[in-house]
């Protein structure tokens, strides 16, 4: 908290940890506009602009309370948001600035926690790909997996109460209540919105929504893991230490009493030393080496946990239990499964010979081709059946710029899906992008694709095919055999922290 106090630089509020005064600082809205919130900006560049603009912000808050136009038509979203008349810009500006402010204590506590644990390369833990080596190492020994959809929407007051344990500023919490209750369409952030309208909150205030949703999930997981550890043979080692919160242990004690009264089940029924929990976005996975009966117990345990503690109605049908050997996990753009590779061994002993059937488990990861084609079709690189088409909006750019754009997209897709066991589907994606690039260039020069490719030669083909090899040659500059073997095998990059729009096909 010392770093947080130093960042505020407000002597008047130093002893109370108030966040509300930051709303009147202009640099907060610069951070919100540029979407560059990170530790270096928070801690190193806090002297960017200390000019107070309380009059402007007060006018925005007053004006925002006098209007209630949350839903707009799809055509209105194409207007200039800054030069045109937009009644929702005031609420958007305040909410984005507020999202930056409430993220400050969370970011600083996370940094101090990582430094206290002496985790040097903490940025690698943020990578999406870091979860797949964990799956490779552990899922081969498990039998059953449960796909879980985290229930929502949650009551608005529960969200405010969740933040109350972290943010000790009543004024900021009152402002948050104002956002949530003033606009009744806040639930459209979580539930689908009608096709004829676009929700201002869901489309333009995603930062505040993501923060509130993540705080809710963090609260749910911290309580769940805490109770899990109380009834397990082995304590969880991968979950970080919980931050100190007001009344946390008192609430946990009350929750344990509620469950002990409502569910008089012996603790050993839930004990499983080989249980793994993984979560990304609104999905989570619970894998176990035990029997389906054990996962069924956890299934109904979670349903009652959500209903009793968060007052969220959840159906048991949202949790599916499957056998790993017969089920594929649709997770982060990959289809992951555990396959049995049969092998026959002939054993010769004197005059007798025996044939031994042996099955070896293998963690298989493939890239689903149809969702990728749908993503390319949505981006206007091909039609719905995968036939490449030109990109007319790019035809006005230079030839080198057009080629560079297509190559960059191809490189990003190959980079993200580098962990696939078989890369045959990626070759088709490269073919679609290459031919779409050729059609775009031919459209620009008013020529046919055949004539343009004949004039260009094999240069365009080399641009698309050598990107992966060039990236690997930087890592293994002297090992050509190793380079080719890695090019055909699985590679996980720990610098990927978000999913590209073309990859996020869920």
From Swiss-Prot:
This is Maturase K. Belongs to the intron maturase 2 family. MatK subfamily. GO terms for cellular component: chloroplast. InterPro entries: Domain_X, Maturase_MatK, Maturase_MatK_N. It is found in: Plastid, Chloroplast. Keywords: Chloroplast, mRNA processing, Plastid, RNA-binding, tRNA processing. Usually encoded in the trnK tRNA gene intron. Probably assists in splicing its own and other chloroplast group II introns. One of its GO terms (molecular function) is RNA binding. HAMAP family: MatK. One of its GO terms (biological process) is mRNA processing. Its main location: plastid.
